[in-house]
Every structure is written in structure tokens, then in C-alpha cells.
């Protein structure tokens, strides 16, 4: 028979690490939706057919003395510290990871706070080194990750900002780079490809096309600068004349000089 959430919590306390796989805490949340006890909202959502609203949590149960009480950081009976960090808005209990509550995001973020700023247009907290250096897309954090199709805004996984402005979970971004280099939404290069383009320049120069293709040109569309240009066809890649990127797509048929038709 499966262990209850309370039994799981007590067992975790006895074994050392408290809480669940998601959070280190010494209390259980009483779900306002179904009155069941769970270590966290994620554990609840995995086991139920509805979601726990973190903002509506009113009560917690101490996993040490089992006292059911008003949500707070320390047990009113046995003084057990429920979490090194506690947010009275999100009802988040966890180890101290220098978290902070962002009023604009509406939830807690892992800090430190001074290393982040809230971009009002993207509607997301970003690292300060991206201030004025990222492409804004309105409410981009409210879109699901195009790789896993899961939520980004409230995810515990860090978001990665692509040069095009779109967001991916950092873990999804790392997996994507194993298969390709382009944003799955707009096909813009997801990282600086300059070094690879220079290598491709060398390969193209060292790989002449057969004589029947040497004067063939094609119209191309660049996925990086969105420019159009007409270039010589090459099987290894066709380089944008405007930004030198090889992240291009053929935009029309091949053109053969009249004297070769």
C-alpha cells in the first residue's frame, strides 16, 4: 500500500533530508482544494486531477509533532523550523537559496535578488548582465517551452533567453544543442555561430562544385537577419551576403545562366 504524504514526510525527517524531491521542508501543506496533506504543490499536482493554488494555502502540519496550524515559518508547538526560507505569499518553504519574492512575477525566484532585474515587457526576472542586451518579446515568459511544451514562468527550471528573445528551459536548451543550433520557433541561431561559419567558409572554398553547378545561383532567405540575397549555389551551405550567416534557406528555384541552358 502506498505511503501517505504524512508518512513520507516523517520518514524523510528520520532519514536526514526533509521534505520531498522538490523542496527541503519540515511541514506538509494542507491543500485548500481537497483538504489533503502534501509536502508541496508539485507532489499534490502529480497525484491529483487538479492543481493546488499555492496562494490559498492557510494551514500546514508539522512533520515532527504533527500539529496542524496556521501557515508560518516555525511550529507553534515544538519550534521546528519548517524552512530556512519562507514566503508568506507563495507559502514556499525551502532551504536558503537566497530566494526572493518578485511582486511583478507574482512568485518567488532563486536569487540573490541583486543579481536579477524584472523586465516589464518580457514579464520575467532576468540576470542583470542581460539588462539592455536582450531582445524583448512581450509576455514571453507566459508562453510554454517549445521543446517540452511545459510552463516556463512558474517552472523551477531556469529559463534560457535565446538571442531572438524566445525562452527555453535551460535543460531543454542544452538538449536541443545536441541535435541542432536553431530556435525551434523562429529558426534564428540559438548561439554565436561565428566561429563555425568561418570553418564553413574554409570548407566551401576547399570543395569546388562540379562544373555544371559553378555558375548556378539561388535566392536565399537568412534566418538570422531575415535578409534576402542571391548567391552561388553550394551543397555545403549558402552564405548570407548581409550578415555572413550560413543559417539560410533557399527561397526560390536555381538560376542557370542563359548560355548554359
Swiss-Prot record:
ZnF CHY-type: positions: 13-80
Question: Gene Ontology terms, cellular component aspect?
Answer: cytosol; nuclear speck; nucleus; ubiquitin ligase complex
Q: Which terms does the record give in the GO molecular function aspect?
A: p53 binding; protein homodimerization activity; ubiquitin protein ligase activity; zinc ion binding
Instruction: Please list the residues that bind Zn(2+) 4.
Output: 87, 90, 101, 108
**Which residues does the annotation say bind Zn(2+) 1?**
20, 22, 40, 43
Q: Where does Zn(2+) 3 bind?
A: 62, 65, 75, 78
GO BP terms: positive regulation of proteasomal ubiquitin-dependent protein catabolic process; positive regulation of protein ubiquitination; protein autoubiquitination; protein ubiquitination; rescue of stalled ribosome; ubiquitin-dependent protein catabolic process
In which residues is Zn(2+) 6 bound? 119, 122, 134, 136
What's the catalysed reaction? S-ubiquitinyl-[E2 ubiquitin-conjugating enzyme]-L-cysteine + [acceptor protein]-L-lysine = [E2 ubiquitin-conjugating enzyme]-L-cysteine + N(6)-ubiquitinyl-[acceptor protein]-L-lysine
**Pathway named in the protein's UniProt entry:** Protein modification; protein ubiquitination
| Pfam families to which the protein is assigned, alphabetical | zf-CHY (PF05495), zf-RING_2 (PF13639), zinc_ribbon_6 (PF14599)
Work out whether the entry's keyword set contains Repeat.
no
The protein's job, in short, is: E3 ubiquitin-protein ligase that mediates ubiquitination of target proteins, including p53/TP53, TP73, HDAC1 and CDKN1B. Mediates ubiquitination and degradation of p53/TP53; preferentially acts on tetrameric p53/TP53. Catalyzes monoubiquitinates the translesion DNA polymerase POLH. Involved in the ribosome-associated quality control (RQC) pathway, which mediates the extraction of incompletely synthesized nascent chains from stalled ribosomes: RCHY1 acts downstream of NEMF and recognizes CAT tails associated with stalled nascent chains, leading to their ubiquitination and degradation.
What PANTHER family does this protein's entry cite? RING FINGER AND CHY ZINC FINGER DOMAIN-CONTAINING PROTEIN 1
Write down what this protein is called. Answer: RING finger and CHY zinc finger domain-containing protein 1
Species: Mus musculus (Mouse)
Amino acid at each position: 500500500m502506498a505511503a501517505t504524504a504524512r508518512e513520507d514526510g516523517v520518514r524523510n525527517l528520520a532519514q536526514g533530508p526533509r521534505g520531498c524531491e522538490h523542496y527541503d521542508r519540515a511541514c506538509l501543506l494542507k491543500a485548500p482544494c481537497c483538504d489533503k496533506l502534501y509536502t508541496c504543490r508539485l507532489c499534490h499536482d502529480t497525484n491529483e486531477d487538479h492543481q493546488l493554488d499555492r496562494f490559498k494555502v492557510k494551514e500546514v502540519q508539522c512533520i515532527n509533532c504533527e500539529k496542524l496550524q496556521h501557515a508560518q515559518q516555525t511550529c507553534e508547538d515544538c519550534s521546528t523550523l519548517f524552512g530556512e526560507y519562507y514566503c508568506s505569499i507563495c507559502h514556499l518553504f525551502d532551504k536558503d537559496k537566497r530566494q526572493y519574492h518578485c511582486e511583478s512575477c507574482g512568485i518567488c525566484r532563486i536569487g540573490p535578488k541583486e543579481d536579477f532585474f524584472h523586465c516589464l515587457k518580457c514579464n520575467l526576472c532576468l540576470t542583470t548582465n542581460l539588462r539592455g542586451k536582450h531582445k524583448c518579446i512581450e509576455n514571453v515568459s507566459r508562453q510554454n517551452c517549445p521543446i517540452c511544451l511545459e510552463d516556463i514562468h512558474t517552472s523551477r527550471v531556469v529559463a534560457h533567453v535565446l538571442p531572438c528573445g524566445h525562452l527555453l528551459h535551460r535543460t531543454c536548451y542544452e538538449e536541443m544543442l545536441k541535435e541542432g543550433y536553431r530556435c525551434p520557433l523562429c529558426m534564428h541561431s540559438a548561439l554565436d555561430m561565428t566561429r563555425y561559419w568561418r570553418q564553413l567558409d574554409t570548407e566551401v572554398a576547399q570543395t569546388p562544385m562540379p562544373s555544371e553547378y559553378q555558375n548556378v545561383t539561388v535566392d536565399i532567405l537568412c534566418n538570422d537577419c531575415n535578409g534576402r540575397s542571391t548567391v552561388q549555389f553550394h551543397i555545403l551551405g549558402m552564405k548570407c551576403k548581409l550578415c555572413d550567416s550560413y543559417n539560410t534557406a533557399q527561397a526560390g528555384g536555381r538560376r542557370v545562366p542563359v548560355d548554359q541552358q
